[in-house]
Regions:
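Feature captures the catalytic cores and cofactor-binding loops of soluble hydro-lyases/lyases
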Residues: 1-103, 116-192
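Beta-strand-loop-alpha-helix segment that lines the small-molecule cofactor/substrate pocket
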Residues: 110
Length: 192
């Protein structure tokens, strides 16, 4: 039954599963199911449970996975041919950690963990995160230059730091890891 949702995956989907934190005798994703997920979605998984066959999964270069545990066991009970878990739904609201996840949510996985973003908020989240990223790059540069103290950068910025940031954006537009058009729009918003 763990293959049913895999068969429904489309390109760019992310397989997100609440497997109730099952560890021993819990894994239902190994290198076979992992290969099937990757073949259909060209993406990876967010899995609140254990996976197995780590070496085989690691052979999938672009198969990104966020999982709770690794265990070499299988989701069939060791005492007979019964499943230790049963699927209760596909494309339904679930919990991953403390987050409620709805079908269609945007999945953002980073080294520090995973975020689930409602699709209607995705554009706002991206724009806000780009501004935060630029502020961080600017702040780190100014800290290395010893122009400002950590206390000044970590606190609400003074008007002079805000003006310096706006000037820095203008000077570096086109050289930053955010598209020039977006940087120019940020500058335009800041200088109204």
């Amino acid at each position: 039954q763990n293959a049913w949702p895999v068969d429904m995956l489309q390109p760019q989907d992310v397989y997100v599963c609440d497997h109730f934190e099952l560890k021993q005798d819990g894994p239902s994703i190994g290198d076979n199911v992992g290969n099937a997920i990757y073949a259909r979605s060209h993406n990876g998984i967010v899995y609140a449970g254990a996976v197995r066959d780590i070496n085989g999964l690691n052979e999938l270069d672009d198969f990104v996975s966020f999982v709770r545990y690794y265990d070499p066991s299988h989701h069939f009970s060791t005492s007979g041919p019964r499943l230790n878990s049963t699927m209760i739904g596909i494309n339904i609201p679930i919990r991953i950690g403390k987050a409620t996840v709805l079908p269609g949510d945007v999945v953002l996985g980073r080294d520090g963990g995973v975020l689930f973003i409602p699709p209607q908020l995705a554009e706002q989240v991206v724009k806000t995160s780009e501004i935060t990223r630029l502020r961080d790059i600017f702040g780190h540069q100014r800290l290395r230059e010893q122009k400002y103290t950590a206390g000044q950068i970590d606190a609400r910025w003074s008007d002079s730091i805000e003006r310096d940031f706006t000037g820095w954006l203008k000077e570096n537009s086109g050289k930053l890891p955010v598209a020039k058009e977006q940087v120019d729009e940020i500058v335009k918003e800041r200088t109204r």
